[in-house]
Regions:
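Short, Lys/Arg-rich, polar N-terminal cytosolic tail immediately upstream
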Residues: 1-17
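Juxtamembrane inter-helical linkers in multi-pass membrane proteins
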Residues: 183-191
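Hydrophobic alpha-helical transmembrane segments in multi-pass membrane proteins
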Residues: 32, 36-42
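Membrane-interface helix-loop-helix modules in multi-pass inner-membrane proteins
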Residues: 51-174, 181-184
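Transmembrane alpha-helix/helix-exit interface in multi-pass inner-membrane proteins
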Residues: 40, 44-51
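Conserved small/polar residues in nucleotide/adenosyl-binding loops
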Residues: 195-197
Length: 197
């Protein structure tokens, strides 16, 4: 490749390592998007299991304990692994620098690190599926979570790790909006869609 051509998300080197070690905001946004789609389908599959159980009276596809586990995992996956981190992570990483006229986010390494923190927290939370599940409901309210199995702790820790990743991503977006806007783009001229990200 010609050395005068600047690398962007279209002409990166090929291979899995170029994706895993990228600092390009669009590629990181695509990684958030693909992981969000994966968790969306996993949560949707759990919703289908619940719907099949409730389709007809007396229809016992799964037991009551397994239903409570599926209910909790569906809610936790859809809220904490899809809606909260994946949508702002995907849309924000792809669109936010383009909307403010920046070439990249303010801290590209922090951007990649927050994706890996999100992935680590998601794996930690998914460990509970293999280890027997959680049956407290996705809100993890105290009476149920204190009387439940020991799987509440890894699920809660995974959610805290995912929340930390979302905080780092949000701080990166705030720094990008504040410091990397093009000249003339004042606070009152910012696109309104930046506020929802």
């Amino acid at each position: 490749m010609n050395e005068n051509i600047k690398q962007n998300y279209l002409n990166h080197p090929k291979g899995i390592m170029s994706w895993l070690l990228t600092l390009d905001h669009k590629r990181i946004g695509l990684m958030y998007l693909f992981s969000g789609i994966l968790f969306f389908f996993l949560g949707g599959l759990l919703a289908l299991v619940m719907r099949f159980e409730l389709a007809a009276p007396g229809n016992d596809i799964i037991s009551n304990e397994v239903y409570n586990n599926v209910y909790t995992l569906h809610g936790a996956i859809m809220i904490f692994l899809f809606i909260i981190p994946a949508i702002p992570g995907a849309l924000g990483n792809i669109l936010l620098p383009l909307m403010v006229g920046a070439k990249d986010v303010a801290f590209p390494r922090l951007n990649l690190a927050s994706f890996y923190i999100y992935s680590f927290g998601a794996l930690f939370a998914m460990y509970t599926i293999i280890n027997g599940g959680v049956d407290t409901g996705w809100t993890f309210y105290t009476p149920y979570s204190t009387q439940s199995s020991s799987n509440v702790v890894p699920m809660t820790l995974g959610i805290f790790i995912i929340g930390f990743s979302s905080i780092l991503t949000g701080l990166n977006f705030i720094a990008t909006i504040h410091k990397m806007r093009i000249p003339g783009l004042t606070w009152y001229k910012l696109p309104l869609s930046l506020i929802h990200i």
